[in-house]
Amino acid sequence: MLQLILGGSGSGKTALLYQRIRTLAQAGKKSILLVPEQFTSSTEGRIYRELGDELSVMVDSFSFTSLAERILSAEGGAAVRTLTDAGRAVLVRRALEQLQDNVQYYYRHRRSAAFCQMAAQTIDELKSAGVSGTQLYDLAQSCGPEQAKLSELALIYQGYETLLAQTGMDPSDRLELAAGRLEAAQARGTMPELLQGRAVFIDEFDTFNAPKKRLLGALLASGASVTVALCDDGAPAEPGDLGLFSGAKQLAAQLRSLARKNGAEVAVPVLLRKDLRHQQAPGLAAVTR
């Protein structure tokens, strides 16, 4: 089941998440709290402050990356080597050398470390967007004057992926692999012990890239209760809306679609309307409205 907790900044979304986590912990039920990488340290501290010594052991906080590693440790794949940025740049150069005459624009840059690093970063961004080398090649055919360059980039991407399969994984591939392992476990009718009977709470995100969406989809398909807090005023989305909450509204719609695609129920969202952060300063509260 998916439930969204919606509200503006300072409306108490995170406080409500911790309240629900506490209630589950008091009932002897464990939870998982997913936050972005940069919030993992501060989240550990807040869990201890909010729940205390006895109840805090009922909660595990993860980033998507660390959760993926735990799944791989349980289901297999953790030992697969992950390439460094330097290793990924070397792989781009090797792909260029193998392509030779098939790439006219970019072959001469094969010995440029800066170009190879930039190409590796571009490939990483394409993966994050869920675009494969084949898809990029197909898209390039309708790009007019840029068709040739984009087609060559797609060939480099495809060559890179072929070499990567013989060498190791990109960091983003580990999330994809973890999602695949979780999907395979579900097909067998099993679940990693880490996820058995646990509610999942997600906070502090304003977007999810393609690998994270796949892992989130696998969690929803497992039947887990997934609660996501989003900075959204809860008003209906309007066509062409570019307002303050437009990104969150799009994300909320994507999450509801993802839940339904994976056979999960979508609960009625919780909407928090009060500005708790500025309740002692009504002037500031008026400015934020």
Regions found by a protein language model. Give the residues of each.
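Accessory N-terminal region flanking or inserted into the helicase ATPase core
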Residues: 1-4, 98-201, 236-243, 279-289
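Glycine-rich P-loop/Walker A and Walker A-like loops and their local beta1-loop-alpha1 context
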Residues: 1-48
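Hydrophobic helix-cap positions at the C-terminus of alpha-helices
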Residues: 20, 24, 182-185, 218-222, ...
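Short glycine-/polar-rich loops that comprise or flank the Walker A/P-loop
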Residues: 27-30, 56-59, 196-197, 222-226
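Conserved P-loop NTPase-based nucleic-acid remodeling module centered on helicase motor cores
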Residues: 28-144, 148
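Structural recognition of the conserved hydrophobic beta-strand(s) that form the central parallel beta-sheet
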Residues: 33-35, 61, 201, 225-230
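Conserved Walker B
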Residues: 204-208
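Conserved RecA-like helicase ATPase core segment
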Residues: 212-289
